[in-house]
Amino acid sequence: MVELISNQVPLPDRDEFFLLMKVLDSAVGTVALGGTAALVKGRPRPFRKLPQDRRERIVRGWQASPIPDLVKAAKGIKTLAGLALFQFATPAAGGRNPYWDGSGYPGPPSAADRRPPVPSKLASEAVLLPRLVDLIAAAPPDASAAKALLAAKGLAVSDGDKPGDVVVEADAVVVGSGAGGGVAAGVLASAGLRVIVLEKGQYWKAADLPLTEAHAFPNMYERGGVFSTRDLSVNVLAGAGVGGGTRINWCASFPTPAHVRKEWAEEHGLPDMVGPRFDRALAAVCGRVGVSTGVAAHSNHNACLGAGLEALGDHRGEIPRNCDNAADCGMCCLGCPTGERGDMTHTFLADAAGAGAVIIAGAHAERVLTSKAAAADGRKAGAVGVLATPMSSPIIQEVAPRKRGAAWRLIVRAPRVFAAGGTMHTPAFLKRSGITCGGWVGRNLRIHPATIVYGRFPAGFKAQGAPPSAAVPGGAGAPPVPGTGTVKMWSGAIMSAFSNQHADWEGTGYGPMLMTPSMHVAGFAGLVPWQGGAAFKSFMAHFPDWSSVLVITRDRGSGTLFTDRFGHPRYKYWGSKFDRASMVTGIEQAVRALAGAGAVEVGSFMSLPHLDLERGGDGALTPAGAAALEAYVATIKAEGVRKNRTAVMSAHQMGTARLGGDPKRSACDPDGQTWQTAGVYVCDGAAFPTSSGLNPMMTIEAIAYMVAEGVALRAGKAVPGVAGAMPAGQCAAILESSYGGGRAAVKPPVPVCGGVGGGVGGGGVARA
């Protein structure tokens, strides 16, 4: 646990946690925080010397305390303990985690069982690697070594004005390599611009991925997956490393819905959002990364949700995905071992590398370098490059840049800077550069606040409420769940079924969606409510039997992104009254869906006891079971979503440097250029005017494509077509096939016309 905290928890939170541990290590401190539970035969004892029942009593007391800091302490201990216990393997257990067997979790596949890479899909690695510099792995000790390393990639290298400065030149520098940065780099380089990509994380080849949470969290997630508000009320999951979130996302690839595009065009001064430019951009990116419907087989996990929605008569649809329709290894959140997912490293980043771009990994972009004179278009200044410092590890260093001890600095001289470090890092980068755009940089943080509901299914069960002829759209029928009768949330296609029943797409456009999350054992253990040691042990012993539903809300309210004393991003967020009510609506629907699918026990990430559902011999709820379900739903409504009593998380962050037609209401103009500084463009999720209500990846990529295409055209460059680009209207057809527009609608699968299989820069392979 100490390793996890030291490497993944921000310094202020880390200090608070270690202070708590110090206080609890004394008898007086334990009495102060634990009351009479810290007394044994009338004498105070430090926490570690108390009997287990007393320790549990203290922590349970904190959970119910009216003092927010005690509630926070209970949540922090529970979360970190769950993550640490189930995340790390130990040599004594043969390289496995001793708790995996007890929870029925198999761990990573053995070499013999590992799904083999698809050679045609991994051809991109041979293109990408020769143009990649990994400063963390190479660790050049000084400027001379750094210059030699960069020169070996064909860059013209020179000395800067200060000792230790290493200067390279480009037409454009892209900060970040995820959905936004990858697309921007690919478009710009393919148009003939000299492009350098700066990425603070590292690159992992498919064959080198261990496929464990212990590796993925610290190396492929921001803050190791522990990126919370100061009060711990919200936790953010965001990708890190070369390829960003596209390397660990759950494959959901929704084209931007029409009602969102209309809102952005009409209310935010962005007419291109409903015009042919955005249509073309969306078709290009959806085609290149291989978006389609028609999953070959829904996992047990998704089948449970589909059966429950069928039982309720609610809308259910199939999620478009950017992977092969037969891909079902369940490892997407730990990195794709086969290349079957169209992430940036197999698509646009590889296109960029093939066109001559250089990707510099392990380079932390500190700030934009600007001219002293006003720009020709009237903006206060113009970009002339980026200052970056080398990273010694993927972990963000909790010291000021001038104190990090780097023997050299990297200066990329370029008149065009593309900020694409993600919704959390882009505003921090701009703020460190003095670019605030009238205060709009860092405002308007939207996160799609999410929580989870889960149900336990008995061995050998048949899902209730769906006749054998029914099917979840686009794939295998929901009833019965096959195999041993266990759900195995970590196995099969991660995300394929969803519901927009209460999303209000035809009205306000704001409301909850239901999907299935990717759930491996440590992430689940860190999130589930804790009701005591015995209850937690029993809960985790049934890990294969649980099926979970993710409730995602399109938020109308917003938060704020700010920087700490080291210049790193931190954030404040708590859902508005409307958004919390939307979450409760989604929680109710999810509970009813799991009950309708045949669960014998349901619970949620709210601090409420689980509900056992009494069923008759036919599997249907008894009258008593039905009454108990209604009472449980009433309790959920009365409890509501409360800070640190409901686990709230986010996998989608948006809006912190938004586009708009009015500089008084946005950070960037419709072309993506900041209102304050010429030549600085935002092309990631930060550019969203509002939240999108669906997985934002394809919208990010489309915005990045449109912004980069515009810059290239204004530079007098021709922008070539993208391999596998869809014909006009194909994205709309995919979205229509996905959600159907009605309850339980079943639409035929829509294949893409190209994808990631055609090799880098070549024509895509059609999917049927």
Language-model regions, residue ranges each:
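Acidic/polar surface patches and capping/hinge elements
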Residues: M1-A89
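N-terminal glycine-rich phosphate/pyrophosphate-binding loop and immediately adjacent elements
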Residues: L132-W264, A388-M391, C437-F457, A463-M495, ...
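A glycine-rich dinucleotide-binding beta-alpha-beta segment and adjacent secondary-structure elements
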Residues: L135, E169, E318, D328-C332, ...
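Core beta-strand elements of the Rossmann-like FAD/NAD(P) dinucleotide-binding domain
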Residues: D165-A170, R404-R416, A420
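Glycine-/small-residue-rich beta->alpha transition segments that form the dinucleotide
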Residues: G178-G180, G201, A414-R416, A420-P427, ...
